[in-house]
Amino acid sequence: MICTFLRAVQYTEKLHRSLAKRLLLPHIVLNKACLKTEPSLRCRLQYQKKTVLPRCILGVTQKTIWTQGPSPGKAKEDSSKQVSVHRSQRGGTAVPTSQKVKEAGRDFTYLIVVLFGISITGGLFYTIFKELFSSSSPSKIYGRALEKCRSHPEGRSSHRPRSDVIARICSP
């Protein structure tokens, strides 16, 4: 995050130098402990060498590598970027905290969306199976009514084939 901020300051200074404008804004200087502001009539980035002792986070030692920019005298000619690369002992690059927070927020959002989708699908399945297999469902009610009609004697005679009905009437 600090590197991004410093990169933005460098681009701003390039813009101010190319337009030959001198602003009376405070100039940013990177110190060992923190960022400080220093009033200056000229906009130029002062490069300082920064040495960082390896930090141990969760049992993994991190190493910070800084590239040294040109001296202040050569800053007018070419201002290069200051880059910070964090590497753990496992060989992979460590992810910044802001990136971890962003990924955790994205993962949480995806979890909420998936849980919402599962609950909607579960509700639909519950409603469908309740309609199909409940004792008060329309299919069960019509099924019971059909069984009563089939078991009734008048219903049985009406469902016989026509030839059986005629044979019964005509036979002595």
From Swiss-Prot:
Keywords from the UniProt entry:
Membrane, Mitochondrion, Protein transport, Transit peptide, Translocation, Transmembrane, Transmembrane helix, Transport
The question of whether Transmembrane is a record keyword is answered with: yes
Task: State the disulfide connectivity.
Answer: none
Q: How does it sit in the membrane?
A: Single-pass membrane protein
Classify the source by domain of life: Eukaryota
Keyword Transcription regulation annotated: no
Q: Name one GO cellular component term.
A: TIM23 mitochondrial import inner membrane translocase complex
Provide the transmembrane region boundaries: 108-128
Where is the protein localized?
Mitochondrion membrane
Task: Give the InterPro entries listed for this entry.
Answer: Tim21
Biological processes per GO annotation: mitochondrial cytochrome c oxidase assembly; mitochondrial respiratory chain complex I assembly; protein import into mitochondrial matrix
**Transit peptide region:** 1-18
Looking at the record, which segments are called Disordered?
Answer: 68-98
Q: How does this chain assemble?
A: Component of the TIM23 complex. Component of the MITRAC (mitochondrial translation regulation assembly intermediate of cytochrome c oxidase complex) complex, the core components of this complex being COA3/MITRAC12 and COX14. Interacts with COA3 and MT-CO1/COX1.
Q: Which family does it belong to?
A: Belongs to the TIM21 family.
What biological function has been recorded for the protein in this entry? Participates in the translocation of transit peptide-containing proteins across the mitochondrial inner membrane. Also required for assembly of mitochondrial respiratory chain complex I and complex IV as component of the MITRAC (mitochondrial translation regulation assembly intermediate of cytochrome c oxidase complex) complex. Probably shuttles between the presequence translocase and respiratory-chain assembly intermediates in a process that promotes incorporation of early nuclear-encoded subunits into these complexes.
Instruction: Return the protein name.
Output: Mitochondrial import inner membrane translocase subunit Tim21
